[in-house]
Amino acid sequence: MSIYHYWGKSRRGETDGGDDYHLLCWHSLDVAAVGYWMVINNIYFIDHYLKKLGIQDKEQAAQFFAWILCWHDIGKFAHSFQQLYRHEALNIFNEPTRHYEKIAHTTLGYMLWNSWLSECPELFPPSSLSVRKSKRVMALWMPVTTGHHGRPPEAIQELDHFRQQDKDAARDFLLRIKALFPLITLPEAWDEDEGIDQFQQLSWFISAAVVLADWTGSASRYFPRTAEKMPVDTYWQQALAKAQTAITLFPSAANVSAFTGIETLFPFIQHPTPLQQKALELDINVDGAQLFILEDVTGAGKTEAALILAHRLMAAGKAQGLYFGLPTMATANAMFERMANTWLALYQPDSRPSLILAHSARRLMDRFNQSIWSVTLSGTEEPDEAQPYSQGCAAWFADSNKKALLAEVGVGTLDQAMMAVMPFKHNNLRLLGLSNKILLADEIHACDAWMSRILEGLIERQASNGNATILLSATLSQQQRDKRVAAFSRGVRRSVQAPLLGHDDYPWLTQVTQTELISQRVDTRKEVERCVDIGWLHSEEACLERIGEAVEKGNCIAWIRNSVDDAIRIYRQLQLSKVVVTENLLLFHSRFAFYDRQRIESQTLNLFGKQSGAQRAGKVIIATQVIEQSLDIDCDEMISDLAPVDLLIQRAGRLQRHIRDRNGLVKKSGQDERETPVLRILAPEWDDAPRENWLSSAMRNSAYVYPDHGRMWLTQRILREQGTIRMPQSARLLIESVYGEDVNMPVGFAKTEQLQEGKFYCDRAFAGQMLLNFAPGYCAEISDSLPEKMSTRLAEESVTLWLAKIVDSVVTPYASGEHAWEMSVLRVRQSWWNKHKDEFEKLDGEPLRKWCAQQHQDKDFATVIVVTDFAACGYSANEGLIGMMGE
């Protein structure tokens, strides 16, 4: 059967783009041509990786990569694939449809190699290796090229998807194109242990380059569909010309600027903080991977210190870019705003770097959308010089989270990087994005057992690839630090141990290289030393009284509650009590639609933010954990439900955060003129010998949110003993007194402690099973399983809800403005929804079917809540999603 009877791409509803179909042989050469130019231009370091594998000549490397790409779609020669599209000029026209087991063409291609093409040595490149050894080397490359859809091909037994004429056509095609690449060879080193190890390490990056070549070579705007028959060498020359234009789709690599001092990035810093000074002085000129752990208080300039380190490493040729991973989308948005004023200084003025915001809701952030500039067919369009930061993010990066990490500078959730070491689809693209890049991870003390284990896997992988990692934290426990250092040492295959630190060893900087560990104290400035007194309240009535007293004095006050329901209930009580007028009262929690959440965030910053002035007087905010990390708020007074000590330290950081005068106006320097800051904690009455129900009997919802009741009791004990949170002096003491391995737990919590300890080790073990096995390279053996539902976080499943209004019988989004449907979304816990779903009017029947068709949602899973202006609908702009609560 002729190679010209097999299609590779069809029109699929496109009105332009060439003929009805694109011959498989031409599509294969399109992708090969893209790969050729990727090597010539060293796009995403593909030439560098091939040099590491021993192909030093660039032309030879380009020909080899192009040749191996010709194999990527050999699975499409299968009859099972070809019958998916019919055309009178193709080989299956008028043939009856046959039933085949549904198998991806990527796996079919790998199967064709294993069962047929591997026995055709005439297809192999010339080599001094024997046929048997050449076959073994080729077997290494086959998963890399055939597994081009984000996952390695499965190793399955031969099936009947290929007729003999299909196998012959595939062989004929590969034989014809071999002559196009006269320089290809199989180096002897690829069959030696060291060469195989090197290949397995680099196969992840090369497989990602294969994906990029396939995506680009599949674009009909560059490669119009062609059904015409012609000699392969004729089409190859055409493909090379088209591909030279197509690769302009890839934004060119930016050139790193020289590091000339702190003013390069931060011209406003006149006097570096002690931590920033350490970042300027550290010896970074060592070979291989490095790990830095920066532990310091809020206000010590950790972010700036980390970026100073990153720029120094980049300027020394140890990285081309960085990715800044944060715990939440809100903190990522805030960091994106901060980076927008700094990142261009990392590169030379004539460069065109990209700054990407990488998380699932980035399209809802206006500043990110404004920063996107497109790369056109010619590749000559430059960013609009009138845009906020002269350059921005190439649209090529922005159209998919899969490609987001490929931008020079990324800011997003840590989850986006963690997905690189888990069996998510296209994890190889994420790994390629992290290669030659510094990973910065902020607030890592907040990681639970599951996330910590995944983070350790990421640190290990970064180290094994020779990359630097910078970890930022308020305070780490000894156990947390030990595990991070151990992960790095596994990556560099060295034995390195973190030193045992005492309670006075804080702030602290740790630097780990392949040969040594440097651990040193960091000085503290007087300005960031804080002393917050602790007060205790044992009833909600006492808390409400305290709020009334604060309002009477003209102070602004926050009460951070552990559960949404508790927050809503207290908000309503305050409204009824008239302690505070409604316009001075704000409620903020996680069960608001994005539209309302953004509005409330803005209100919160306006009333409680750094620049707030007279308008803050007498204001009250009832909030949940959503304000712990992302918002720079500054309250005169604060109440908090009892929470684990690290969270209380974080919450206390929002209490009298900035220096103000007695009227609440910000001062540039001097002493704060307000009353001594006191964090008042709502907690059960103290009990030296608590029973198992110590917390649940007094604070039922808090007991559910924080099930490790022993740690809650330990938190109350150490804060009662100390009476203050003194930073940085008592930071290590507070953390180790709650999370240390040698703490004594009361007998009443023995059962709870056993359950929590079991959960801790179970979560870590389960997370460990989710990590990829990188040792065999990019192949089917990388993971024992590919669970349908994977997550970077071990939390209860959530449900996505859309809010809609019915206006003149038309379903319209709750939110107004741009991205209205996305802004009308909120997510709730599955268990909460199961309990309350019957309390809402939901779209169903034909209206739901139409809505799903318009919004490209699955009607079996989509839930659209109909809301009105009446509270009975279960949602309000002031209270969020409440259902029938309180009715």
What is the meaning of each model-derived region?
Residues R481, E541, E545-Q611, C635, ...:
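C-terminal helicase lobe and adjacent C-terminal extensions/tails of nucleic-acid helicase motors
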Residues L432-I438, H445-Q520:
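Post-DEXD/H (motif II) to motif III coupling segment of the RecA-like Helicase ATP-binding lobe
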Residues A340-E408, L414-M418:
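A substrate-engagement module of RecA-like helicase motors
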Residues A258-E295:
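Conserved pre-motif I regulatory segment
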Residues G288-A310, C447-D448:
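Walker A/P-loop
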Residues G321-W343, L355-D366, L476-Q480:
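Conserved Walker A/P-loop ATP-binding site and its immediately adjacent core
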Residues M1-S257:
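Accessory nucleic-acid engagement/destabilization modules that flank
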Residues V492-A567:
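Conserved interdomain linker/interface between the two RecA-like ATPase lobes of SF2 helicase motors
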